[in-house]
Amino acid sequence: MAYPYELGFQDASSPIMEELLHFHDHTLMIVFLISTLVLYLITIMLTTKLTHTSTMDAQEIETIWTILPAIILILIALPSLRILYMMDEINSPSLTVKTMGHQWYWSYEYTDYEELSFDSYMVPTMDLKPGELRLLEVDNRVVLPMEMPVRMLISSEDVLHSWAVPSLGLKTDAIPGRLNQATLMSSRPGLYYGQCSEICGSNHSFMPIVLEMVPLKDFEIWSSSML
């Protein structure tokens, strides 16, 4: 989860988020090198007293600044496409959960079970227990097994919403009349917080998401108690 005054990303808790963090560092380093080079060239141009008034063109330099950006774009595009295909790939999910966005709460349905569904509302500030987080706690958490691929089917009943859990690298639009899907797999147990990430009305800020990732044995106990 996020910490006060945090400047970086949340700790990665899924393979996809780890890949995204590596890609971010890779791209940021390229941007840093380009910015440094441009700043150096500008400084040289502003401080040098040398001029060459008879130069009309420079084929060598033009060739360099045509080929070099192409190489840089390839170095950015290849890992980006790799992660994009990884995010879309779903290999034999062990569980499927359908989530529907409403103004302003989420509803969940475990499609592998006959009667396992519930609504998830934000806990009001006056009802919070010691240690709970304001605007992030819900009355019904989404309990899922850790270290197992889970398919999320995401849609909306009314307006555009977006189902997002940053530490798992998830953000999928919930669109009325359309069913989007995403894959999640947590590498460790814990509570993972998210929020609706699409402005959807006056109470947009009051649509938190809480995933509780537990070992498979504990998930089976929980699912049995909910049926």
From Swiss-Prot:
Q: What terms describe the molecular function in GO for this protein?
A: copper ion binding; cytochrome-c oxidase activity
A cellular component term, taken from the record's GO annotations: mitochondrial inner membrane
Cysteines paired by S-S bonds: none
**Regions of this protein lying in the Mitochondrial intermembrane compartment:** 1-14, 88-227
The enzyme class is translocase
Q: Where is the signal peptide?
A: none
> What residue ranges are annotated as transmembrane?
15-45, 60-87
Q: Which residues bind Cu cation A1?
A: 161, 196, 200, 207
Query: In the record's cofactor note, how is the cofactor described as bound?
Result: Binds a dinuclear copper A center per subunit.
- Give the multimer and partner information: Component of the cytochrome c oxidase (complex IV, CIV), a multisubunit enzyme composed of 14 subunits. The complex is composed of a catalytic core of 3 subunits MT-CO1, MT-CO2 and MT-CO3, encoded in the mitochondrial DNA, and 11 supernumerary subunits COX4I, COX5A, COX5B, COX6A, COX6B, COX6C, COX7A, COX7B, COX7C, COX8 and NDUFA4, which are encoded in the nuclear genome.
Protein name per Swiss-Prot or TrEMBL: Cytochrome c oxidase subunit 2
Could you tell me which species this protein originates from? Cavia aperea
